[in-house]
Amino acid sequence: MTDKLIIFDTTLRDGEQSPGASMTKEEKIRIAKHLERMKVDVIEAGFAASSNGDFDAIHTIAGLVKDSTICSLARANDKDIQRAADALKPANSARIHTFIATSPLHMEKKLRMTPDQVFEQARLAVRFARKFTDNVEFSPEDGSRSDLDFLCRVLEAVIAEGATTINIADTVGYGVPELYGNLVKTLRERIPNSDKAIFSVHCHNDLGMAVANSLAGVKIGGARQVECTINGLGERAGNTSLEEIVMAVKTRKDYFGLDVGLDTTQIVPTSKLVSQITGFVVQPNKAVVGANAFAHASGIHQDGVLKARDTYEIMRAEDVGWTANKIVLGKLSGRNAFKQRLQELGVSLDSETELNAAFMRFKDLADRKSDIFDEDIIAIVSEESAFAQEQEHYKFVSLSQRSETGEQPQAKVVLALDGKEVTGEARGNGPVDATFNAIEGEVGSGSELLLYSVNAITTGTQAQGEVTVRLSKSGRIVNGVGTDPDIVAASAKAYIAALNKLHSKDDKLNPQRS
């Protein structure tokens, strides 16, 4: 049995299924590049059959990412598998991940298939996938609620057909650690050809036990792959958190006895990128990547850490990518210094045009804000990269406001609609409401505001505000993110970013889930 734990990241597929976390192709590419830099073993880049947009994203990522295996999800049918294979053609290393539900509830109520029909479809799906690659993963959806004898029968058959990874899906987060770990162990013991495949765990966090269940699957069950997402992103209560799995196994190597090949210094930068793109703010007390993960407020704890860090710290903050909040650049800094700092942060822009545009935004910010931090630079580049790579139907031009005591604030917003400037004016219950009303008066999107949140990128009164806006229309939910030292301007940018995503025609199907 290998002593390495394979990390399978599904942020771009299962993570994206979280309401409001839908990503553009360009955003997926940026995250995929960060995952490759982190040395993630397998990147599930999407579900090729779900939409042309997802197919295109997988195909592009497969051509750009060379050091990680690129995977596409596919239902257990020839059409889905063919689509996945086509999307993965440019990949140096490709994997097809096919699945079908095996629990009595899912077979009867959702699939309306008999166990024998499911058995045959699973077997034939793996056989067909093997025509395109020798790296095939099979997942029994809702595996943790499946009949054990039937599950053994299905898994033995798909391994015989050539499945090289068997992924035990706790699709609804029903498992508890001891039972789930023993399920994986029992499957490996009872299936005669289990030694021909690597067993994997895929857990959801509905009862708050996704990480615990995954670790039990590894320690008790002998699984050697964990499927997880950055920040635990995922539908409902989320998925197994990559950062927690990786650091648990590394920190407690004495217990797990496994190696993880990731560059853990990339964890926090990647966490921040995913949070910025999706608009899902990381809770301050989140393990490993939360702002308070390495903070000590108790006087006793502070005294201990000052004397010896290991009194209260079991990990080093710098080992997961936390850096001191240092002032790095100012208004006198030149283009070369800006470019060098981007390289030090591991940030790349695709063209000189993007670099020049980002530098101009940096100079504009430096004129308004005396101290520029790494977080400011990352926010600038993230927003500029999104502007450069996405087609903007709506573009923010300018904003002015007027507010007098006892009267509703008034906002005047200038927008460019496909290059033509229009001006909207409106009042509202506060400056942000007035601004949104002014935008809607010109755009008329008919969308519903589901979420409005503000986060300070750095500390101090000069800090940039990062605003997340979540809009819903006709069943589609999108996030928009905007940054600016002026919170109302940041709000306008975020609202417009969300409108641009709504305007996109790349609607997705609602796939079966594992």
Curated annotation (Swiss-Prot):
This is 2-isopropylmalate synthase. Mn(2+) binds at D14, H202, H204, N239. It is an enzyme of class 2 (transferase). It comes from the Bacteria. Residues 5-268 form the Pyruvate carboxyltransferase domain. GO terms for cellular component: cytosol. Belongs to the alpha-IPM synthase/homocitrate synthase family. LeuA type 1 subfamily. GO terms for biological process: L-leucine biosynthetic process. It is found in: Cytoplasm. Its main location: cytoplasm. NCBIfam families: leuA_bact, PRK00915.1-3, PRK00915.1-4. Keywords: Amino-acid biosynthesis, Branched-chain amino acid biosynthesis, Cytoplasm, Leucine biosynthesis, Manganese, Metal-binding, Transferase. Its EC number is 2.3.3.13. GO terms for molecular function: 2-isopropylmalate synthase activity; acetyl-CoA C-acetyltransferase activity; manganese ion binding. Pfam families: HCS_D2, HMGL-like, LeuA_dimer. Residues 395-514 are annotated as: Regulatory domain. Catalyzes the condensation of the acetyl group of acetyl-CoA with 3-methyl-2-oxobutanoate (2-ketoisovalerate) to form 3-carboxy-3-hydroxy-4-methylpentanoate (2-isopropylmalate). Homodimer. InterPro entries: 2-IPM_HCS-like, 2-isopropylmalate_synth_dimer, AIPM/Hcit_synth_CS, Aldolase_TIM, LeuA/HCS_post-cat, LeuA_allosteric_dom_sf, LeuA_bact_synth, PYR_CT. PANTHER family: 2-ISOPROPYLMALATE SYNTHASE 1, CHLOROPLASTIC-RELATED, HOMOCITRATE SYNTHASE-RELATED. Pathway: Amino-acid biosynthesis; L-leucine biosynthesis; L-leucine from 3-methyl-2-oxobutanoate: step 1/4. Disulfide bonds: none annotated. Its cofactor is Mn(2+). It catalyses: 3-methyl-2-oxobutanoate + acetyl-CoA + H2O = (2S)-2-isopropylmalate + CoA + H(+).
